[in-house]
């Protein structure tokens, strides 16, 4: 089922999400939420989605793609379901990059993010996940996990000369919503 995506200004996006409780692991309810999130993400051409964006207060993010029309120059990111994540930078190197968000439609901005990270958490059955990521993969993970602490990417922008409407900044980029 395609779910509605909350938009910036909805106070539910500002909440800190609690961890997915142990009793939900492996449940049909959790699997339905994950299936709905993937269907929703694909429907709008996104590269990631966090449960709070669909109004569910849980530490759950999904991300991954082979090729993205929204980010045509980005390298592929493996499809991942990540619960109760922890992100640790593995170097102090920070990289600026353009970001958009399904909850901030039609806009893009340059956001600084750690270039190299380790992310940990669990999968829907409770098995541990421990991965290293860099570049766009690291950016996507950090962006999605920000939603779990009630943070949207515009709050991380340092130069508002590099923030605006996608259609103005990137004419001809075909995206249904940004």
Swiss-Prot record:
Its cofactor is Fe(2+). GO terms for molecular function: metal ion binding; peptide deformylase activity. It catalyses: N-terminal N-formyl-L-methionyl-[peptide] + H2O = N-terminal L-methionyl-[peptide] + formate. Keywords: Hydrolase, Iron, Metal-binding, Protein biosynthesis. Binds 1 Fe(2+) ion. GO terms for biological process: co-translational protein modification; translation. Fe cation binds at residues 101, 143, 147. Pfam families: Pep_deformylase. The keyword Iron applies. InterPro entries: Peptide_deformylase (IPR023635), Peptide_deformylase_sf (IPR036821). The keyword Protein biosynthesis applies. Belongs to the polypeptide deformylase family. Removes the formyl group from the N-terminal Met of newly synthesized proteins. Requires at least a dipeptide for an efficient rate of reaction. N-terminal L-methionine is a prerequisite for activity but the enzyme has broad specificity at other positions. This is Peptide deformylase 2. It comes from Pseudomonas putida (strain ATCC 47054 / DSM 6125 / CFBP 8728 / NCIMB 11950 / KT2440). The gene is def2.
